[in-house]
């Protein structure tokens, strides 16, 4: 930390104000400030240069004016940088566990440089660099943890069971399907375009897939793909899709409630009408968030890293270039514009 402080410009994506309905690019704006490339003397903070920013559906919730119930889901602060998962390189450190030049992933501001004041709570070191660094925004980061533990811990899949994944081509869904296939399950996914449907079958190895936008009766579609019913539903959509799934669950089926992207931008969320199916089919539904499992990150890596190296898992990313394109990339999630995990590359290592 010794030496003369060096100040550099720092582009930031600022959150303008709380959002109602679909987010727009104009709900964010770009500004440039300056930042010293040294952590404050005596501080245990870590200063990082951000390389990749992660765009994730949960961020829409943080754009709303939320009650302060859960610090993991607090609102973004108007006038401050958007916060999200990112991959970064340590520029300077006052913390004994983080050294200059090391690569990390965790929660950062949407900016070129971030000062992380609680690195032991917010940062994970990157040890495996024989894969694309951007994977730590997805496959090897929060979405991967979400996919793996939502499937294994909540749903406990058994060989031969029938698994349905909604929003299946997204950051989490594409992994759930592949993990379930590795565990010997029959897997069907739904997505919003023919391109994504083909991706599910040809790239990710799903047994079947369908375009939900071309199906006028989702109950009938699910009966077609699951004539004997669904054992496991990995829930990413909510609303009418959840209603249709409940009619098609098998006795003692399990539902991991990961997200409900169809509801995030509605002024009035849709109700669910087929809840009695939960009772007479003895269906288990459990909600969870990725933070619940961060302490088990090493267990996840033990499973997924060998699978990547052996070519058993593949991952598709949609990478936008430049921090100035980050607002459009985030907003595009909610119209299905992305194909695969949405990432923004803002610097090279």
Residues covered by each model-derived region:
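Eukaryotic N-terminal low-complexity, Ser/Thr- and Lys/Arg-rich leader segments
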Residues: 1-36, 348-349
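Short, well-ordered loop/turn sites that connect or cap secondary structure elements
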Residues: 97-98, 157, 249
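Adenosine-nucleotide cofactor-binding segment
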Residues: 181-244, 267-269, 291
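C-terminal capping/lid region of NAD(P)-dependent oxidoreductase domains
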Residues: 2-10, 310-319, 327-349
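Glycine-rich phosphate-binding loop and adjacent beta-alpha segment
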Residues: 237-313, 347-349
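Glycine-rich beta-strand-centered segment in the early N-terminal region that forms part
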Residues: 36-55, 63-110
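A structural motif shared across PLP-dependent enzymes of the aminotransferase-like
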Residues: 107-123, 296
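Mid-domain Rossmann-like dinucleotide-binding core that forms the NAD(H)/NADP(H) cofactor-binding site
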Residues: 133, 137-215
């Amino acid at each position: 930390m010794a030496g003369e402080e060096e100040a550099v410009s720092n582009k930031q994506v600022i959150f303008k104000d709380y959002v109602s309905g679909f987010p727009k690019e104009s709900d964010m704006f770009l500004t440039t400030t300056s930042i010293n490339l040294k952590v404050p003397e005596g501080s245990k903070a870590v200063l990082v240069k951000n390389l990749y920013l992660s765009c994730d559906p949960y961020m829409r919730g943080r754009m709303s004016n939320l009650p302060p119930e859960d610090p993991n889901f607090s609102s973004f602060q108007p006038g401050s940088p958007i916060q999200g998962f990112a991959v970064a390189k340590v520029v300077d450190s006052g913390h004994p566990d983080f050294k200059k030049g090391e690569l990390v992933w965790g929660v950062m501001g949407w900016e070129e440089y971030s000062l992380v004041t609680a690195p032991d709570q917010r940062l994970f070191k990157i040890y495996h660099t024989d894969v694309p660094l951007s994977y730590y925004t997805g496959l090897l980061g929060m979405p991967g943890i979400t996919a793996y533990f939502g499937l294994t811990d909540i749903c406990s899949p058994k060989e031969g069971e029938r698994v349905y994944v909604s929003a299946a081509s997204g950051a989490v869904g594409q992994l759930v399907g592949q993990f379930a296939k590795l565990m010997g399950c029959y897997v069907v996914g739904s997505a919003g375009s023919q391109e994504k449907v083909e991706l599910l079958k040809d790239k990710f190895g799903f047994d079947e897939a369908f375009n939900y936008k071309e199906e006028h009766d989702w109950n009938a579609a699910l009966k077609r793909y699951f004539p004997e019913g669904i054992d496991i539903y990995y829930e990413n959509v909510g609303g009418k899709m959840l209603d249709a799934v409940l009619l098609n669950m098998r006795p003692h089926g399990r539902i991991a409630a990961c997200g409900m992207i169809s509801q995030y931008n509605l002024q009035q969320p849709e109700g669910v009408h087929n809840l009695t199916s939960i009772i007479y089919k003895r269906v288990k539904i459990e909600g969870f968030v990725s933070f619940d499992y961060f302490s088990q990150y090493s267990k996840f890596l033990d499973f997924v890293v060998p699978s990547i190296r052996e070519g058993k898992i593949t991952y598709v990313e949609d990478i936008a270039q430049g921090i100035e394109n980050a607002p459009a990339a985030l907003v595009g999630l909610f119209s299905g514009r992305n194909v695969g995990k949405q990432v923004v590359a803002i610097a090279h290592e």
